C-alpha cells in the first residue's frame, strides 16, 4: 500500500477534534498529569465520570520517570503501595514500611489504566485560568471550567486567545 500523507493528516485532525469536542463539557477536569493526576483520573473515570486531564508538558507522569536522581526506581510507603498494586503495578518490600517499584512500569501503568478507564489526556496544554460563576449566595460560587491554551503559545509569549472547557 502506498502511503498517503493527506490521509494521515486528516486522521490526526479529525480524531483529535472529535476527542476535543467531546471534552468541552466534562464531569471532572484535572490539571497536571503527574502521578496524582493520573491516579485521580483513573479512579474517577473508573467510577463512570467523564474525565479530561491536561498536562502542560509533552510527557505525562511528572518526575516519576526519573525516580531518585535518575535511578528509575521509586520508593513508596503503605498507602502508595496499595494504590500502585490496585492499579496493577508490582512493588517489592525494601525495609519495614518502604516499598520500591520500577518507575517506568509505574508511570506507564498509571497512564494506561487512566486511559483504559475512559479518561482523556491532553498533553502540551497549559491552564491559563479558571472559570468562576458567582451566584447570589457566596456558598454557591464555584469553579465551573478551565481556560486553556497550547503550551507552545505560552512559552513563545504569543497573544493568542485561549479556549475553554466546562466541568
Where do the protein language model's features map onto the residues?
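Extreme N-terminal leader/targeting segments of oxidoreductases
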Residues: 1-28, 113, 117, 130, ...
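Conserved N-terminal glycine-rich FAD pyrophosphate-binding loop of Rossmann-like flavoproteins
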Residues: 4-6, 22, 57-80
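Glycine-rich Rossmann-fold phosphate-binding loop(s) that bind the pyrophosphate
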Residues: 32-36
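Conserved FAD-binding subdomain of flavin-dependent enzymes
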Residues: 43, 59, 72-94
Amino acid at each position: 500500500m502506498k502511503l498517503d500523507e493527506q490521509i494521515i493528516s486528516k486522521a490526526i485532525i479529525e480524531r483529535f477534534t472529535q476527542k476535543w469536542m467531546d471534552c468541552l463539557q466534562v464531569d471532572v477536569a484535572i490539571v497536571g498529569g503527574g502521578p496524582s493526576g493520573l491516579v485521580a483520573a483513573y479512579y474517577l473515570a473508573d467510577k463512570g465520570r467523564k474525565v479530561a486531564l491536561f498536562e502542560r508538558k509533552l510527557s505525562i507522569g511528572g518526575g516519576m520517570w526519573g525516580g531518585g536522581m535518575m535511578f528509575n526506581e521509586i520508593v513508596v510507603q503503605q498507602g502508595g503501595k496499595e494504590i500502585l498494586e490496585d492499579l496493577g503495578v508490582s512493588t517489592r518490600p525494601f525495609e519495614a514500611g518502604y516499598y520500591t517499584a520500577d518507575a517506568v512500569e509505574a508511570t506507564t501503568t498509571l497512564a494506561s489504566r487512566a486511559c483504559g478507564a475512559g479518561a482523556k489526556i491532553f498533553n502540551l496544554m497549559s491552564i491559563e485560568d479558571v472559570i468562576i460563576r458567582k451566584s447570589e449566595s457566596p456558598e454557591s460560587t464555584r469553579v465551573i471550567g478551565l481556560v486553556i491554551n497550547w503550551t507552545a503559545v505560552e512559552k513563545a509569549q504569543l497573544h493568542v486567545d485561549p479556549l475553554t472547557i466546562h466541568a
